[in-house]
Amino acid sequence: RTSMRNQLPCVVTAVTAVAHGPMVAVDLRTPCGQALASLVTRESADLLGLAPGLGVLALCKATAVAVGPTVEGTTAQAQPGTGCTLQGVVADVSPGLGAQEVALTLPSGHLWVGFAPQTEGLVVGRAASGRFAPSAVVMGLAS
């Protein structure tokens, strides 16, 4: 168990040392083929034995995910310097003060939860994207 509601099985596609630093960029592929990225320390990468082909569980706090409408013609992306974007369809919207919690159904059927300003106009059934920093993606070994 964990308090992180966003949990997605992924496969490592690349592990790249970040120049002049203790960080490692890890490229991941989701079950629906979308790309994710994670930044971890070299020590963490070694402890997990991260290598292409390894199955991992990618986790991310809902509070780290900014949800907004999907812009026509954009695709899912994952770049360590600029961030990650997962695309899905709004499954649920829970209003709150100033922000609303939004659950996205990804093409794989998994849910990805984040927050959006009330002004985004997100409604159930509408295409939307969740954006978050690679540093917010935690990995665990899949069992």
Residue spans for each PLM region:
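Short aromatic-glycine-enriched beta-strand elements
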Residues: 19-27, 95-103
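Glycine/charge-rich catalytic "coupling/switch" loops of P-loop NTPases
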Residues: 1-9, 14-16, 34-35, 39-98, ...
